[in-house]
Amino acid sequence: MRKIIALSVALATLLLSFSASAQQPQRRITPNDTLKSVRVLPDGSAVFSIYAPKARTVSLTGDMMPWGQPITPVEKDGVWSFSIPNVKPGSYRYHFIVDGVQVYDPKSPTTTQNTALAVVDPSGNEFFSYRPDIPHGALAVRTYWSKTLGRTRTMRVWTPAGYEAGKAKLPVLYLIHGGGDTDVAWPTVGCAGDILDNLLADGKMVPMIVVMPDGSCDISMFEKDLMADVIPFIESNYRVLADKDHRAVSGLSMGGIETLEVIFQNPDKFGYVWCLSGGFNPGVDIQKEAERLNVRTNAAIINKNCKEFVMTQGGPTDITYVSGERANKLFDEIGLNYEYQEVGEGHTWYTWKINLYDEAQRLFKKK
């Protein structure tokens, strides 16, 4: 009798489960199931897509967008696609704007809380490509207390392969991002770690530590934070050569403005200066800025102490080109020894990656 009851209960349970399964609606297959949100085509164009069937408007923004040229989307079956021609190899941040709301690519494995990264590298042989067959350095996020700003801040620190097991003291490059970015920019979209790893593995650069501080604050306060907080932190926590001949500063765009602020406020503290797509703040009178920074007196001090002072631009299409020209004209007037370079890729991360590639090969080699 007990066996019959147990069998009846089992059969009833099985029938109920089949009934529930039959009543559960099957999910409808949509184009989103097979959608690849970023595609690089053989002709060098890149297509960015998002599934938004109920959206009224969708747009795309990112580092790879042609300057001043909006891209009109094509919508089909709820998929909005944007085709961008002639995308240079590189890493690009991007996001969609759906009915006025920022949306970070839900299909991308690189999407974080506030960004998505598209890697366009068809050959895998670019100077910034990741090479699995070489030693790799370490990238650390370091937190420090800024007495200058009265708050906790972060910086990224790249140390070369073998640093942890070594004993030698190394020179330091302080590498600053541009406006609207943070210390995250150079290691991600700027591919700094891969560029440095490749150069070191090929014997093209001096082993060094590269510090990428957060420049997203008032320019004059950044200079104070760098000198009073960032550099002392590095020199207390890493094996570094703590003298001007083994200390370099470099920054792009807004970071270039900060670079000039740093060197003219501290003309005897850095042996190498690279200002990338930068100049003096375009919103201020350059003569007043020259007076504030005492550039005429400090130029002589810089000439005596600095082994290399380089100004770069991304060519006439670089939005800081005029600002750079103004700075160069002033430097000519005051007798500052500097070198000028142009990379014809505009105000883009492709330009600045080339700059870092060139710069890193030259730093700390002059006697």
Describe the role of every protein-language-model region.
Residues 1, 13, 26-27:
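Short, intrinsically disordered low-complexity segments
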Residues 1-9:
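Bacterial N-terminal signal peptides that target proteins for export
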Residues 8-17:
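Bacterial N-terminal signal peptides
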Residues 18-22:
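Sec/Tat signal peptide C-region and signal peptidase I cleavage site
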Residues 23-30, 34, 40-69, 74-367:
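Non-catalytic cap/lid and distal C-terminal segments of serine-dependent acyl enzymes
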